[in-house]
């Protein structure tokens, strides 16, 4: 038992290490369950955390008037981060605006149990989502995005570029 404890400790530490993201996933439209972006010039992708391997890190849902996409990175412990998109009026491939006028928005949060920074698109800080695949039969949604979002705490805005997603809609 004494020999097993150090081995388990090392395995736990290895499993909970953050993986550096060296490149974004390729933009695809096959339901590959991928997501990535550059947040203020730093690459971001969903990641699990060793002690929470079953937590959902990427999900999408159709809603009556659009779609919601969530992507989470739990591996940056103690700070975790998340994207949420609510895109209204999705009716196939096309360009959709992220602003407060149409009800569509992008939201990005960093938190240590409670939020330490929150940003959301609005009438002044906007962006777009370009949906390239919207296959309701196969339940695949794919596309690209970019936006600048205002801080809800009065901090500097966040700039998100080179975004891409390819998700299976639940």
What are these regions (language model features)?
Residues 45, 93, 150-153:
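Residue-level signal for secondary-structure boundary sites
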Residues 18-24:
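Bacterial lipoprotein signal-peptidase II cleavage site
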Residues 32-34, 54, 168:
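Long, charged/polar, soluble alpha-helical segments
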Residues 43, 51-138:
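Surface-exposed helix/loop patches within compact recognition domains
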Residues 1-17:
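Sec-dependent bacterial lipoprotein signal peptides
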Residues 127-170:
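C-terminal or internal capping secondary-structure element at the end of a domain, subdomain, or sheet
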Residues 26-47:
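Post-signal peptide N-terminal segment of mature Sec-exported envelope proteins
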């Amino acid at each position: 038992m004494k020999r097993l404890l150090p081995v388990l400790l090392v395995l736990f530490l290895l499993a909970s290490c953050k993986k550096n993201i060296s490149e974004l996933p390729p933009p695809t439209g096959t339901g590959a369950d991928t997501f990535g972006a550059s947040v203020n010039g730093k690459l971001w992708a969903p990641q699990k955390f060793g002690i929470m391997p079953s937590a959902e890190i990427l999900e999408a849902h159709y809603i009556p008037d659009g779609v919601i996409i969530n992507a989470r990175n739990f591996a940056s412990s103690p700070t975790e981060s998340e994207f949420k998109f609510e895109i209204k009026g999705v009716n196939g491939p096309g360009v959709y605006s992220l602003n407060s006028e149409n009800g569509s928005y992008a939201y990005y949060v960093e938190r240590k149990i409670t939020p330490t920074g929150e940003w959301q698109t609005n009438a002044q800080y906007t962006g777009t989502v370009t949906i390239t695949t919207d296959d309701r039969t196969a339940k695949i949604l794919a596309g690209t995005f970019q936006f600048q979002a205002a801080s809800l705490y009065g901090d500097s805005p966040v700039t998100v570029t080179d975004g891409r997603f390819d998700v299976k809609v639940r």
